[in-house]
Every structure is written in structure tokens, then in C-alpha cells.
């Protein structure tokens, strides 16, 4: 699915990521602008690993591109360049060589995680004296708008479905859990579409919990990026797959604060088995966003019924100025306050360079 929506999927109130003085910081004692998820340089009382008395305080193993691509060199890569072109997102220049370098090791790693998860389930069943089929293994893919997370999700789903032990793979995006435009208008939230309060977070949580619990048939709403709204009476049906790939900006958000003291709160991330955060410099993401917007202006935005048709009918420079304003006032704010702080919750972080090529991988230590 090609995303033409200018906003992001979010699942956690912005106030959860602010200090009492409203300056941004997900860490209570950190200066504004410091992300807890920055595994390379976190400004805090313990920013120097020597303060902990250990040589390396990072929860991640860091590998550069060459180190990562050398792993799993014998693993199969059942894709062609034509397959890659069908799967990649608009504006993402990924080719077969990049897939070979990045996704061959990644799918081999995922296959190992899945096998380990199934073995653990088998041992637990033996301990309890019960026999239950394994529940779906859930892989989450998060990251900014325009960073390429949709391409990552599609490639992972396509590759994992080629393995004999996991032939049934479903891909669901969180776009379908946006509230309908009618509801947003009633609540005065159309201008904040894409912010946490514009999502049906309960429905999303119930969907993921049902899938992970092994429900035989679960449905998710369908969102149209052309009309910029939920499609009435249409659903995606998930029927107990081997793997569910869940893609969206909100999938790693922690649970919001409970309204009752001592109340237990669950988040989508509580049901995820393996999570991937696609990372890049915000300036690069902005450029990719504007490039994609201009391409859509001359393609998808021209379609009859397109919510964005007004952009197709104005000069490019005027349209790009509007797109840049959306980036600065909406997407960049969401990235800094809601998305980037979840990076440190991911199992694996894929960092891209300015040319959309993977430059670094961070893998959480077991």
C-alpha cells in the first residue's frame, strides 16, 4: 500500500513525553530535546558508561553495514529485482543488492527468533501438560512517515512467507484504526488527524490482543489514502496466521497513564514478539517526504475523488511550500515527541543514510 497521508500513526498522548514545564523530554531529569531512545548518546545522570562500572552500558549490539551484511550469507533470498520493485514504497530506491545486504540477515534472524518462540511454547505446554498450537508471532515495524517502514514491512512479510515453516503471513497497518472523519469533525479533531487522540486505540489494542491470543478470525478496518478516510463496511480479515507483520508509527508506544490509581494498562507493544524501528536523520526524512509529495501530486493526487486533489491543481512550488509546512508543524513534531522516543523500545534499529541505504544496525542484547 502506498501511503499518501501527510500525518502519522500515533498511539500515546504527547503529555506522556513532556516534562512538567512542557519542554520536551521523555526523561524527567534530561534537558529538552534528549531522547531516551538514543542508544548512542543519551544525556542523563548516567550518560558515561564508566558511571555504571561496566565498559559498555548500551543495551544494543552495534554492527556496521559490512558486519551485518556478512551474516547469514548462505540463507536463501527468493526474490528478483521485479519482486523488489513491486514491494518498495514510492520514493524508496531500494534494489535487490540492498535487499540482499539487509534483509537476508534480518529474515534469518527472525526465523531463529520464531523457532525459539515455538520451542518455548512447546516446553511451556509440556510443563503444564497441555497441547496448544503456537499463537501467531507478531513482528512490529515502526518509524517516521516517509522513512521507508512500509517497504520494510512488505519485504519482511514477503520473505518470511517463502520459508516452509511460516507460509501464512499477514500484513496489517495501523491506518485502519484512525477514527472516521465524521467522528473527527464532531470532536473538532480534523486538524489533528494523526495525533494520538485521532485513533481508536482501544480497537487497535483489542485487535492485536485477539490475534496474539490465537483467535481464529479477527477483523481490522480498512483505510483509504485516496479519500483520506475509513472505508465503510470493509475489513481486513486475519485468520490465525503463522506471522502477523504490524506496521505503523504507534506500535511501540507505551501504555497511556491509567485514569485510576493502580489500574493496569496494556499497550500494543505488550503483544509484540520482535520489533523493528526504521531510523534516519530528520533532515533526510524531510527531503524524502517532500520528494514523495511532489511525485504524488502528479499521480495519486490527480485521481477522481482524491482528498488531496487540490494540490494537483496548484503550481509545484506552492504545493511544496504547503507540504513543508505540514512537515514542520505536524510530522516533525510527531517524530520528536511521539515516535523517536520509542526507538529504544525496539528489538532492532535499522539506520539509513541520506541515500536510503542501511548504514548501521542495533540489535538488542538478549
Label the predicted regions.
Residues 144:
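P-loop (Walker A) phosphate-binding loop of NTP-binding proteins
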Residues 58-138:
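Extreme N-terminal, non-catalytic leader segments
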Residues 158-170:
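Post-Walker A helix-loop "phosphate-sensing" segment adjacent to the P-loop in P-loop NTPases
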Residues 43-74, 88, 93, 251-366:
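Conserved NTP phosphate-binding and transfer environment spanning the P-loop NTPase/kinase superfamily
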Residues 149:
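Conserved lysine of the Walker
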Residues 93, 98, 170-172, 177-227:
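Conserved nucleotide-sensing/catalytic segment adjacent to the nucleotide-binding pocket
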Residues 129, 133, 202-270, 327-342:
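Glycine-rich phosphate-binding loop used to anchor ATP phosphates in small-molecule kinases
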Residues 152, 156:
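Hydrophobic positions on the alpha1 helix immediately C-terminal to the Walker A/P-loop
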Amino acid at each position: 500500500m502506498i501511503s499518501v497521508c501527510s500525518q502519522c500513526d500515533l498511539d500515546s498522548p504527547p503529555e506522556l513525553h513532556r516534562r512538567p514545564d512542557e519542554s520536551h523530554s521523555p526523561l524527567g531529569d534530561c534537558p529538552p530535546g534528549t531522547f531516551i531512545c538514543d542508544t548512542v548518546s543519551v544525556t542523563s545522570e548516567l550518560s558515561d558508561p564508566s558511571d555504571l562500572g561496566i565498559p559498555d552500558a548500551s543495551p544494543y549490539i552495534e554492527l556496521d553495514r559490512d558486519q551485518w551484511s556478512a551474516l547469514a550469507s548462505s540463507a536463501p533470498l527468493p526474490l528478483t529485482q521485479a519482486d523488489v520493485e513491486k514491494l518498495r514504497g514510492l520514493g524508496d530506491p531500494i534494489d535487490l543488492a540492498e535487499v540482499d545486504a539487509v534483509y537476508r540477515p534480518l529474515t534469518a534472524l527472525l526465523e531463529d527468533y520464531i523457532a525459539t518462540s515455538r520451542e518455548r511454547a512447546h516446553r511451556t505446554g509440556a510443563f503444564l501438560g497441555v497441547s496448544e498450537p503456537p499463537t501467531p508471532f507478531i513482528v512490529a515495524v515502526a518509524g517516521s512517515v516517509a522513512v521507508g517502514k512500509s517497504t520494510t514491512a512488505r519485504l519482511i512479510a514477503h520473505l518470511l512467507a517463502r520459508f516452509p515453516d511460516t507460509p501464512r503471513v499477514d500484513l496489517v497497518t495501523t491506518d485502519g484504526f484512525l477514527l472516521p472523519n465524521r467522528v473527527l469533525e464532531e470532536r473538532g479533531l480534523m486538524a489533528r488527524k494523526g495525533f494520538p487522540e485521532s485513533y481508536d486505540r482501544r480497537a487497535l489494542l483489542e485487535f492485536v490482543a485477539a490475534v496474539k491470543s490465537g483467535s481464529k478470525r479477527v477483523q481490522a478496518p480498512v483505510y483509504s489514502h485516496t479519500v483520506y478516510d475509513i472505508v465503510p463496511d470493509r475489513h481486513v480479515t486475519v485468520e490465525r496466521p503463522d506471522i502477523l507483520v504490524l506496521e505503523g508509527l504507534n506500535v511501540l508506544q507505551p501504555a497511556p497513564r491509567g485514569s485510576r490509581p493502580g489500574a493496569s494498562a496494556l499497550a500494543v507493544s505488550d503483544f509484540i514478539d520482535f520489533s523493528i524501528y526504521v531510523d534516519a536523520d530528520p533532515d533526510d526524512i524531510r527531503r524524502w517526504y517532500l520528494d514523495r509529495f511532489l511525485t504524488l501530486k502528479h499521480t495519486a493526487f490527480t485521481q477522481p475523488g482524491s482528498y488531496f486533489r487540490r494540490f494537483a491543481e496548484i503550481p509545484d512550488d506552492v504545493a511544496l511550500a504547503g507540504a513543508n509546512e505540514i512537515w514542520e508543524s505536524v510530522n516533525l513534531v510527531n517524530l520528536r515527541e511521539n515516535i523517536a522516543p520509542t526507538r529504544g523500545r525496539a528489538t532492532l534499529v535499522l539506520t539509513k543514510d541520506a541515500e536510503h541505504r542501511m548504514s548501521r544496525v542495533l540489535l538488542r542484547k538478549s
